[in-house]
Regions:
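Long C-terminal appendages of very large multidomain proteins
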Residues: 279-336
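Second RecA-like catalytic domain
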Residues: 1-296, 300
Length: 336
């Protein structure tokens, strides 16, 4: 995830999300205030993604902290956040950023911690943006660890690109929702669903929320945990989601999810097969998507080009491949 974030110019978001997944959830829910805490957490809901929601909450905390200790205390109190966990995420970010710098994937522009390539949420976030809850600082840099070079974070506000990078980091953890939950989504119709069933998704979906229907994972049925931002959604923008953690009780629950498109899965997922005669593509022999011949050929070309780009960056870390990354973003329409 972080390597792709550096290549495609959204390294700050990638590093923050990776750090947050390495720590416990910063949201707290006191037993006697669970409903209030849940409502506070949902004010950060962004782009049908728990990972972007965490990113937005963390970003808001850094902004509040910059306004003084009182503002920080009020922010943490009002949004039911753990300062200790947020500090842990910040420290983990510094470590991850240092590792990327050590292997040559990013450069320190020198100087202090402001004025670097910040990230914000001012565009391409038409799903539950809630900008009043702290998203979009836009100008803050890498903090005490040294400012990140602007080219490494030039696409820090591109929500779709960040979701694609999350997809790259979390695959093969994929959950498929019923088609009825995504009536207005485009490009979501598979040739046949996972397990070979018509449409996949394992539930009726019509009139129900995402938390009331079963999803299909590679190892069977699973359900959204009530803490996910998509739990009460009656419509999703895509049938497909990637997740980091599951918990098994009476059922298998997905603790976090980011909706992703078939294109993201085709570009950043597993083994890709193109079936021109069926006008379809298959990812890892279980995710099936319709694709016209021209589109399928383009996806295959972009996939090969992207894998070569990653290999080139790994073997020649000092080489600037940002222009190549921009070409892929433009060709795949992962633009803000």
């Amino acid at each position: 995830m972080m390597l792709y974030g550096a290549i495609f110019g959204c390294v700050e978001a990638a590093v923050t999300i990776a750090a947050a997944m390495s720590c416990r959830n910063p949201f707290v829910a006191p037993f006697d205030k669970r409903d209030v805490a849940d409502e506070a957490r949902r004010t950060f809901a962004l782009a049908l993604s728990d990972h972007l929601t965490l990113l937005k909450a963390f970003d808001g905390w850094r902004l509040a902290r910059g306004c003084g200790s009182r503002a920080e205390r009020e922010y943490i109190r009002d949004h039911f956040l753990s300062r200790q966990t947020l500090v842990m995420v910040e420290e983990m970010r510094k470590q991850f950023r240092g590792l990327l710098r050590d292997i040559g994937f990013i450069e320190s522009s020198g100087g202090g911690g402001s004025g670097g390539g910040g990230y914000g949420y001012g565009r391409n976030n038409n799903n539950n943006s809630n900008s009043s809850s702290g998203g979009g600082r836009g100008g803050e840099g890498a903090g005490a660890g040294g400012a990140v070079e602007h080219s490494s974070n030039v696409n820090g506000g591109n929500i779709q690109l960040i979701k694609a990078v999350v997809c790259a980091g979390l695959y093969p953890n994929v959950a498929v929702a019923p088609a009825a939950l995504c009536p207005s989504a485009t490009g979501n119709a598979p040739g046949k669903g996972p397990k070979g069933g018509k449409g996949g998704g394992g539930g009726a979906g019509g009139g129900k929320t995402a938390g009331e229907v079963s999803l299909v994972g590679r190892k069977g049925a699973m359900f959204l945990h009530p803490m996910t931002v998509n739990f009460d959604k009656k419509e999703l923008d895509s049938r497909y989601g990637v997740y980091h953690e599951v918990v098994k009780t009476s059922k298998v629950y997905v603790r976090d999810m980011t909706t992703v498109t078939p294109l993201m899965l085709a570009l950043f997922g597993g083994s890709l097969q193109v079936h021109h005669e069926k006008q379809a593509i298959t990812v890892d022999k279980w995710l099936h998507f319709r694709a016209e011949r021209r589109a399928a050929t383009l996806v295959k070309y972009l996939r090969v080009h992207m894998e070569r780009l990653l290999l080139r960056k790994i073997t020649h870390p000092q080489e600037d491949v940002s222009s190549n990354g921009r070409d892929i973003i433009q060709a795949s329409n992962l633009q803000a």
